[in-house]
Amino acid sequence: MTDVELWDLPTNNDRLAGVLQLEGKRAIDVGCGAGGLVRFLREQGADPIGVECGDAMIAQAQQADPDHVDSYLAGVGQDLPLDDGSADMVIFSYSLHHVPADEMSKAVLEAERVLKRGGELVVLEPIAEGPGFEVFQTVDDETEVRALAQAALDARPSSFTETHTERYEGAYSFTDFDELKKKVIDIDPTRAKAFESVGDEVERRFRQNGVSGPGGIWLQGDVLLRVFIKSI
């Protein structure tokens, strides 16, 4: 960990803007959730599309972005609702590990299919260690699926060449435990059942591992950013 306060660390969006050329790019955010990254990409001059499998999350994204409701499509990473060679960039931000384990490699192939030659596959994945991970591990231990996501990238098609790899310290905040619980369940509604039995322990770890700061309680968690270019 650095000596910088968690809330002063560059955000994931800051990291992407520093590594990628976004202006004018047709960028696909796979697993876009409530659309925060889609809106950021547009602010950076990109032409973004969000793909999301959860109806409730699509509704949230469209409500937050009423002038661009058509920018959000229902779909999954392993079967993208997009034409061949139609995108300059495909981004999986904290989403590749949510693809079913036996279809992660297919999701990488789908990215290859929709990318133009010279297009980029961009993947941000949380590392399965650290204070933040320990909080969520009780309700949903993602150690294995996060490792499988990296393995799927390592087994990528030969058309992909890795051009950038960076592990960095990340942070995220919640106003309180109730917000954390809501967001975790919004991402995967099946987690509601787990909270019934382990919610008290999740809250204990949240208060133990979190750091009070601007806007609420902050948690630390390292991120691995990998970028690949489609060469053929």
Map each language-model feature to its residues.
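Class I SAM-dependent methyltransferase SAM/SAH-binding core
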Residues: 28, 33-79
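Conserved alpha-helix/loop element of class I SAM-dependent methyltransferases that forms part
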Residues: 6-25
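A short SAM/SAH-binding and catalytic strip from SAM-dependent methyltransferases
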Residues: 88-103
